[in-house]
Amino acid sequence: MKATSALYKSLLADKNHATEIKAVIAGREYGQDRIASCCVTGGLFAESGWSIGGAVARELQLKLAPLGDIPRMGEIRLYLRLTLGGRASEWLPAGVFYIDTRAEEAVSHMLTLHGYDAMLKAEAVWLDPTQDAGEWPMAMRTAVNRIAARMGVEVDPRTSILPYTVEYPNDYTMREALGFIAAAHGGNFIITDAGRLLLHTTAALPAETNFLVESETGRAILLGEVRLLV
């Protein structure tokens, strides 16, 4: 969960609010005036649906008017905030992505960037022969820390790893190893909006409810003081 201000919560509760996005690429900030479209896909589960034992990546499709050269495989940091009637909330991180492909329109020179989050950095074989292989079996907590370091990301402090061990991985990729560790905990690894590696377990999901709720805020719909059931 993101820590948000009272203003953000107030704006979110108003169905008339708007969402504003910005992107920071190579030190340059792109606001709504430069961004034509933005789409992020992916989440807690793989495309096949509800599952555990995954290391799930998100994808970004961003179309913008470039302010200058954009480096290949450059980093894109997305942010969002809520606005309404001259009021604006704080900017919240909305993902960190790395450019995979680009396409420029011949006439408008608009640039469409496609990228993935840092999870794709885990596609490399885990054991690097130039580094100390460590002792096996290895504690899963140690394994996660080492893989995160190889990926160049931090481990989210909310990640809780049980005192299990992982066997020698042979030629498994880091992503496959993360999937094995995630399965042992009944969850999936993801990259958070802040760019950290997080083990999200089914135990961390919100409690199921049969209340009829508002699509925007998730609040229960009341008839007088009675909550409606579905």
Description of each model-found segment:
Residues 1-134, 178-186, 212, 217-219, ...:
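Assembly/oligomerization scaffold segments
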Residues 47-49, 121-144, 155-180, 203-211:
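Short acidic/polar beta-strand-loop edge motifs in secreted extracellular
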Residues 109-111, 195-198:
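Hydrophobic residues embedded in beta-strands of well-ordered beta-sheets
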Residues 151-160, 184-196:
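Short, well-structured beta-strand/strand-turn elements
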Residues 176-188, 196-197, 201-203:
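Internal metal/ion-chelating core segments
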Residues 205, 220-221:
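A compositionally biased, intrinsically disordered/low-complexity signal enriched
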